[in-house]
Amino acid sequence: MIVRERYMRLIRDFMDKPVIKIITGMRRSGKSALLELTRQELLDRGVDRKNIIFINFESLRYEALRDYKALYAEIIKIAGQTEGRIYVLLDEIQEVNTWEQVINSLRVDLDCDIYVTGSNAKLLSGELATLLAGRYVEIQVYPLDFDEYLAFAAENEDEAKLSKREQFANFLRFGGLPGIHQLKWDEDRVMQYLHDIYNSVLLKDVIARNRIRDTALLESIVLYLMDNIGNTFSAKTISDFLKSQGRKLSTETVYNYLKALESAFLIHKVVRFDIKGKRILETQEKYYLSDLGLRHAVIGYRDNDIAGVLENTCLLYTSPSPRDRSVSRM
Protein backbone atom coordinates (compact mmCIF):
# COMPACT_ATOMS: atom_id res chain seq x y z
CA MET A 1 0.00 0.00 0.00
CA ILE A 2 1.40 3.40 -1.02
CA VAL A 3 1.87 5.79 1.90
CA ARG A 4 0.41 9.28 1.38
CA GLU A 5 3.07 10.92 3.45
CA ARG A 6 1.62 14.43 3.67
CA TYR A 7 -1.39 13.02 5.55
CA MET A 8 0.49 10.41 7.56
CA ARG A 9 2.78 13.15 8.90
CA LEU A 10 -0.28 14.92 10.32
CA ILE A 11 -1.64 11.71 11.81
CA ARG A 12 1.73 10.85 13.40
CA ASP A 13 1.91 14.34 14.92
CA PHE A 14 -1.31 13.66 16.82
CA MET A 15 -0.81 9.99 17.71
CA ASP A 16 -1.27 9.38 21.44
CA LYS A 17 -2.27 13.01 21.90
CA PRO A 18 -5.53 13.73 23.80
CA VAL A 19 -7.49 14.78 20.70
CA ILE A 20 -9.83 12.79 18.48
CA LYS A 21 -8.46 12.50 14.96
CA ILE A 22 -11.30 13.06 12.46
CA ILE A 23 -10.34 12.26 8.86
CA THR A 24 -12.84 13.78 6.42
CA GLY A 25 -13.18 13.91 2.66
CA MET A 26 -15.17 12.82 -0.35
CA ARG A 27 -16.11 9.18 -0.69
CA ARG A 28 -13.29 7.11 -2.28
CA SER A 29 -10.69 9.84 -1.78
CA GLY A 30 -8.48 7.53 0.31
CA LYS A 31 -9.70 7.93 3.90
CA SER A 32 -10.07 4.19 4.54
CA ALA A 33 -6.57 3.54 3.21
CA LEU A 34 -5.20 6.18 5.59
CA LEU A 35 -6.98 4.50 8.49
CA GLU A 36 -5.44 1.17 7.46
CA LEU A 37 -2.02 2.85 7.25
CA THR A 38 -2.63 4.25 10.73
CA ARG A 39 -3.31 0.73 12.02
CA GLN A 40 -0.06 -0.47 10.42
CA GLU A 41 1.84 2.46 11.92
CA LEU A 42 0.55 1.52 15.38
CA LEU A 43 1.62 -2.09 14.89
CA ASP A 44 5.06 -0.95 13.72
CA ARG A 45 5.33 1.08 16.93
CA GLY A 46 4.79 -2.06 18.97
CA VAL A 47 1.10 -1.73 19.83
CA ASP A 48 -0.43 -5.17 20.44
CA ARG A 49 -2.92 -6.18 17.75
CA LYS A 50 -5.49 -6.97 20.49
CA ASN A 51 -5.38 -3.32 21.57
CA ILE A 52 -6.50 -2.03 18.17
CA ILE A 53 -10.23 -1.94 17.43
CA PHE A 54 -10.89 -1.40 13.70
CA ILE A 55 -14.49 -1.18 12.46
CA ASN A 56 -15.63 -0.32 8.93
CA PHE A 57 -19.30 0.65 9.06
CA GLU A 58 -19.76 0.12 5.33
CA SER A 59 -19.47 -3.63 6.01
CA LEU A 60 -22.62 -5.59 6.85
CA ARG A 61 -20.50 -7.46 9.36
CA TYR A 62 -20.84 -4.47 11.67
CA GLU A 63 -24.42 -3.49 10.85
CA ALA A 64 -25.58 -4.21 14.42
CA LEU A 65 -23.02 -1.71 15.71
CA ARG A 66 -24.57 1.20 13.82
CA ASP A 67 -26.65 1.73 16.94
CA TYR A 68 -24.59 3.97 19.21
CA LYS A 69 -25.40 2.05 22.40
CA ALA A 70 -24.43 -1.27 20.81
CA LEU A 71 -21.18 0.24 19.52
CA TYR A 72 -20.29 1.67 22.92
CA ALA A 73 -21.04 -1.65 24.66
CA GLU A 74 -18.92 -3.62 22.17
CA ILE A 75 -15.89 -1.35 22.55
CA ILE A 76 -16.17 -1.37 26.35
CA LYS A 77 -16.38 -5.18 26.25
CA ILE A 78 -13.23 -5.49 24.11
CA ALA A 79 -11.38 -2.95 26.25
CA GLY A 80 -12.21 -4.96 29.36
CA GLN A 81 -10.46 -7.99 27.88
CA THR A 82 -7.16 -6.23 27.18
CA GLU A 83 -4.51 -4.39 29.14
CA GLY A 84 -3.13 -0.95 28.38
CA ARG A 85 -4.26 1.78 26.03
CA ILE A 86 -6.91 0.97 23.42
CA TYR A 87 -6.72 2.36 19.89
CA VAL A 88 -10.15 2.86 18.32
CA LEU A 89 -10.31 3.23 14.52
CA LEU A 90 -13.81 3.74 13.10
CA ASP A 91 -14.34 4.02 9.34
CA GLU A 92 -17.34 5.97 7.91
CA ILE A 93 -18.60 6.89 11.36
CA GLN A 94 -21.54 8.90 9.98
CA GLU A 95 -23.34 5.56 9.52
CA VAL A 96 -23.76 5.39 13.33
CA ASN A 97 -26.68 7.33 14.75
CA THR A 98 -25.63 9.95 17.36
CA TRP A 99 -22.06 8.66 17.05
CA GLU A 100 -20.65 11.74 18.77
CA GLN A 101 -22.06 10.50 22.10
CA VAL A 102 -20.09 7.27 21.72
CA ILE A 103 -16.86 9.11 20.96
CA ASN A 104 -17.27 11.51 23.85
CA SER A 105 -18.09 8.70 26.30
CA LEU A 106 -15.11 6.60 25.17
CA ARG A 107 -12.86 9.60 25.61
CA VAL A 108 -14.09 9.99 29.19
CA ASP A 109 -14.38 6.32 30.20
CA LEU A 110 -11.30 4.69 28.63
CA ASP A 111 -7.59 5.17 28.19
CA CYS A 112 -7.89 5.32 24.43
CA ASP A 113 -6.70 7.03 21.28
CA ILE A 114 -9.48 7.58 18.74
CA TYR A 115 -9.40 7.91 14.94
CA VAL A 116 -12.53 8.21 12.81
CA THR A 117 -13.29 8.87 9.15
CA GLY A 118 -16.39 10.42 7.62
CA SER A 119 -17.72 11.50 4.24
CA ASN A 120 -19.82 14.43 5.39
CA ALA A 121 -18.76 17.87 6.60
CA LYS A 122 -21.72 17.92 8.99
CA LEU A 123 -19.66 15.60 11.18
CA LEU A 124 -18.05 18.73 12.57
CA SER A 125 -21.20 20.70 13.24
CA GLY A 126 -23.98 20.74 15.76
CA GLU A 127 -23.74 18.50 18.79
CA LEU A 128 -20.24 17.30 17.97
CA ALA A 129 -18.88 20.82 18.07
CA THR A 130 -20.47 21.25 21.50
CA LEU A 131 -19.42 17.89 22.97
CA LEU A 132 -15.89 17.84 21.61
CA ALA A 133 -15.00 21.52 21.34
CA GLY A 134 -11.22 21.79 21.52
CA ARG A 135 -10.84 18.00 21.74
CA TYR A 136 -10.62 17.02 18.08
CA VAL A 137 -8.51 17.80 15.05
CA GLU A 138 -9.78 17.53 11.48
CA ILE A 139 -7.56 16.10 8.76
CA GLN A 140 -9.24 16.73 5.42
CA VAL A 141 -8.22 14.34 2.65
CA TYR A 142 -8.28 15.24 -1.02
CA PRO A 143 -7.85 13.10 -4.13
CA LEU A 144 -4.26 12.51 -5.23
CA ASP A 145 -2.06 15.42 -6.25
CA PHE A 146 0.15 14.88 -9.28
CA ASP A 147 3.16 13.58 -7.34
CA GLU A 148 0.92 11.07 -5.57
CA TYR A 149 -0.75 10.24 -8.88
CA LEU A 150 2.65 9.33 -10.36
CA ALA A 151 3.45 7.10 -7.39
CA PHE A 152 0.16 5.22 -7.77
CA ALA A 153 0.50 5.03 -11.55
CA ALA A 154 3.94 3.46 -11.20
CA GLU A 155 2.25 0.47 -9.55
CA ASN A 156 -0.06 -0.05 -12.54
CA GLU A 157 1.56 -2.07 -15.32
CA ASP A 158 -0.25 -0.19 -18.10
CA GLU A 159 0.33 3.30 -16.71
CA ALA A 160 3.97 2.74 -15.83
CA LYS A 161 4.81 2.67 -19.55
CA LEU A 162 3.58 6.23 -20.11
CA SER A 163 5.71 9.39 -20.19
CA LYS A 164 5.27 12.07 -17.55
CA ARG A 165 3.58 14.31 -20.14
CA GLU A 166 1.09 11.53 -20.90
CA GLN A 167 0.57 10.96 -17.18
CA PHE A 168 -0.23 14.64 -16.64
CA ALA A 169 -2.74 14.58 -19.49
CA ASN A 170 -4.38 11.56 -17.85
CA PHE A 171 -4.31 13.30 -14.47
CA LEU A 172 -6.27 16.24 -15.88
CA ARG A 173 -8.69 13.95 -17.68
CA PHE A 174 -9.27 11.19 -15.10
CA GLY A 175 -8.64 13.04 -11.83
CA GLY A 176 -7.00 11.83 -8.66
CA LEU A 177 -9.19 9.19 -7.04
CA PRO A 178 -6.80 6.41 -5.95
CA GLY A 179 -9.08 3.57 -7.08
CA ILE A 180 -8.61 4.25 -10.79
CA HIS A 181 -5.06 2.88 -10.54
CA GLN A 182 -6.35 -0.52 -9.45
CA LEU A 183 -8.08 -0.98 -12.81
CA LYS A 184 -6.70 -2.34 -16.03
CA TRP A 185 -5.95 0.95 -17.79
CA ASP A 186 -8.76 1.46 -20.27
CA GLU A 187 -10.54 4.80 -20.72
CA ASP A 188 -14.05 3.34 -20.89
CA ARG A 189 -13.45 1.22 -17.79
CA VAL A 190 -12.02 4.16 -15.83
CA MET A 191 -14.86 6.47 -16.84
CA GLN A 192 -17.46 3.86 -15.84
CA TYR A 193 -15.78 3.51 -12.44
CA LEU A 194 -15.80 7.30 -11.96
CA HIS A 195 -19.43 7.58 -13.05
CA ASP A 196 -20.37 4.90 -10.51
CA ILE A 197 -18.60 6.86 -7.76
CA TYR A 198 -20.38 10.04 -8.82
CA ASN A 199 -23.73 8.25 -8.55
CA SER A 200 -22.76 6.82 -5.15
CA VAL A 201 -21.76 10.21 -3.76
CA LEU A 202 -24.89 11.85 -5.13
CA LEU A 203 -27.27 9.14 -3.92
CA LYS A 204 -25.78 8.21 -0.53
CA ASP A 205 -24.05 11.37 0.64
CA VAL A 206 -26.27 14.05 -0.87
CA ILE A 207 -29.76 12.82 -1.79
CA ALA A 208 -30.34 10.26 0.99
CA ARG A 209 -28.55 12.14 3.75
CA ASN A 210 -30.34 15.41 3.01
CA ARG A 211 -33.68 13.80 2.06
CA ILE A 212 -33.72 15.57 -1.29
CA ARG A 213 -36.86 14.80 -3.27
CA ASP A 214 -36.22 16.74 -6.47
CA THR A 215 -33.26 14.72 -7.69
CA ALA A 216 -33.59 16.06 -11.24
CA LEU A 217 -33.12 19.60 -9.93
CA LEU A 218 -30.06 18.56 -7.94
CA GLU A 219 -28.50 16.97 -11.01
CA SER A 220 -29.24 20.10 -13.05
CA ILE A 221 -27.37 22.17 -10.47
CA VAL A 222 -24.42 19.77 -10.53
CA LEU A 223 -24.30 19.93 -14.33
CA TYR A 224 -24.32 23.74 -14.17
CA LEU A 225 -21.39 23.67 -11.72
CA MET A 226 -19.46 21.24 -13.90
CA ASP A 227 -20.08 23.34 -16.98
CA ASN A 228 -18.93 26.55 -15.31
CA ILE A 229 -15.72 25.72 -13.43
CA GLY A 230 -13.52 28.78 -13.26
CA ASN A 231 -16.47 31.19 -13.55
CA THR A 232 -17.95 33.35 -10.82
CA PHE A 233 -21.66 32.99 -10.14
CA SER A 234 -24.15 32.83 -7.27
CA ALA A 235 -27.12 30.75 -6.21
CA LYS A 236 -29.30 33.40 -7.86
CA THR A 237 -27.36 33.04 -11.11
CA ILE A 238 -28.09 29.31 -11.12
CA SER A 239 -31.71 29.90 -10.14
CA ASP A 240 -32.21 32.42 -12.96
CA PHE A 241 -30.60 30.08 -15.50
CA LEU A 242 -32.74 27.10 -14.50
CA LYS A 243 -35.88 29.25 -14.52
CA SER A 244 -35.01 30.21 -18.11
CA GLN A 245 -35.03 26.46 -18.83
CA GLY A 246 -38.57 26.16 -17.47
CA ARG A 247 -37.77 25.03 -13.91
CA LYS A 248 -39.69 26.44 -10.95
CA LEU A 249 -37.46 26.98 -7.95
CA SER A 250 -36.26 29.54 -5.44
CA THR A 251 -32.77 30.88 -4.85
CA GLU A 252 -32.95 29.45 -1.32
CA THR A 253 -33.50 25.95 -2.71
CA VAL A 254 -30.42 26.28 -4.91
CA TYR A 255 -28.42 27.55 -1.95
CA ASN A 256 -29.50 24.57 0.19
CA TYR A 257 -28.56 22.12 -2.56
CA LEU A 258 -25.15 23.77 -2.93
CA LYS A 259 -24.59 23.37 0.81
CA ALA A 260 -25.53 19.69 0.56
CA LEU A 261 -22.98 19.20 -2.24
CA GLU A 262 -20.34 20.98 -0.17
CA SER A 263 -21.12 18.81 2.85
CA ALA A 264 -20.44 15.70 0.75
CA PHE A 265 -17.10 17.25 -0.30
CA LEU A 266 -18.16 17.03 -3.95
CA ILE A 267 -17.56 20.77 -4.43
CA HIS A 268 -15.66 23.54 -2.66
CA LYS A 269 -16.80 27.15 -2.47
CA VAL A 270 -14.29 29.97 -2.75
CA VAL A 271 -15.60 33.40 -1.73
CA ARG A 272 -14.67 36.70 -3.37
CA PHE A 273 -12.50 39.17 -1.52
CA ASP A 274 -12.53 42.87 -2.30
CA ILE A 275 -8.85 43.84 -1.98
CA LYS A 276 -9.60 47.55 -2.19
CA GLY A 277 -12.34 47.43 0.43
CA LYS A 278 -10.66 44.62 2.41
CA ARG A 279 -13.87 42.69 2.87
CA ILE A 280 -15.50 39.41 1.90
CA LEU A 281 -18.11 39.79 -0.83
CA GLU A 282 -21.32 37.84 -0.34
CA THR A 283 -22.15 37.19 -4.00
CA GLN A 284 -20.53 35.72 -7.11
CA GLU A 285 -18.43 32.97 -5.55
CA LYS A 286 -16.51 30.31 -7.44
CA TYR A 287 -17.15 26.61 -6.98
CA TYR A 288 -14.51 24.00 -7.68
CA LEU A 289 -14.86 20.23 -7.97
CA SER A 290 -13.08 17.87 -5.62
CA ASP A 291 -12.20 15.62 -8.53
CA LEU A 292 -12.15 16.51 -12.20
CA GLY A 293 -12.45 12.87 -13.21
CA LEU A 294 -16.03 12.86 -11.94
CA ARG A 295 -16.77 15.91 -14.09
CA HIS A 296 -15.39 14.29 -17.21
CA ALA A 297 -17.21 11.02 -16.51
CA VAL A 298 -20.48 12.97 -16.45
CA ILE A 299 -20.12 15.67 -19.14
CA GLY A 300 -17.05 14.49 -21.04
CA TYR A 301 -13.59 15.99 -21.45
CA ARG A 302 -13.46 19.10 -23.64
CA ASP A 303 -10.19 20.66 -24.78
CA ASN A 304 -11.66 24.17 -24.78
CA ASP A 305 -12.30 23.88 -21.01
CA ILE A 306 -8.57 23.63 -20.25
CA ALA A 307 -8.36 27.04 -18.53
CA GLY A 308 -11.03 26.10 -16.00
CA VAL A 309 -9.60 22.60 -15.60
CA LEU A 310 -6.14 23.98 -14.80
CA GLU A 311 -7.59 26.58 -12.42
CA ASN A 312 -9.52 23.86 -10.59
CA THR A 313 -6.36 21.75 -10.36
CA CYS A 314 -4.25 24.63 -9.03
CA LEU A 315 -6.89 25.55 -6.43
CA LEU A 316 -6.95 22.04 -4.98
CA TYR A 317 -3.25 21.29 -4.99
CA THR A 318 -1.58 24.59 -4.10
CA SER A 319 -3.60 25.23 -0.93
CA PRO A 320 -3.83 23.22 2.30
CA SER A 321 -7.56 23.77 2.08
CA PRO A 322 -9.80 25.51 -0.49
CA ARG A 323 -11.60 27.03 2.47
CA ASP A 324 -8.50 29.18 3.00
CA ARG A 325 -8.68 30.64 -0.52
CA SER A 326 -10.58 33.60 -1.92
CA VAL A 327 -11.12 35.08 -5.37
CA SER A 328 -9.87 38.65 -5.46
CA ARG A 329 -11.60 41.71 -6.87
CA MET A 330 -9.43 44.76 -7.44
Report each predicted region and the residues it spans:
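Hydrophobic anchor at the beta1->P-loop junction of P-loop NTPases
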Residues: 23
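Interdomain motor-coupling "hinge/lid" segment immediately C-terminal to the ATP-binding subdomain
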Residues: 127-227, 231
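Pre-Walker A adenine-sensing motif
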Residues: 3-14
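Positively charged, low-complexity/disordered segments
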Residues: 322-324, 328-330
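Accessory nucleic acid-recognition modules appended to NTPase machines
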Residues: 193-319, 323
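Short glycine-rich substrate-engagement loop in P-loop NTPases that contacts/grips substrate
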Residues: 55-80
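Conserved lysine of the Walker
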Residues: 31
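Hydrophobic positions on the alpha1 helix immediately C-terminal to the Walker A/P-loop
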Residues: 34
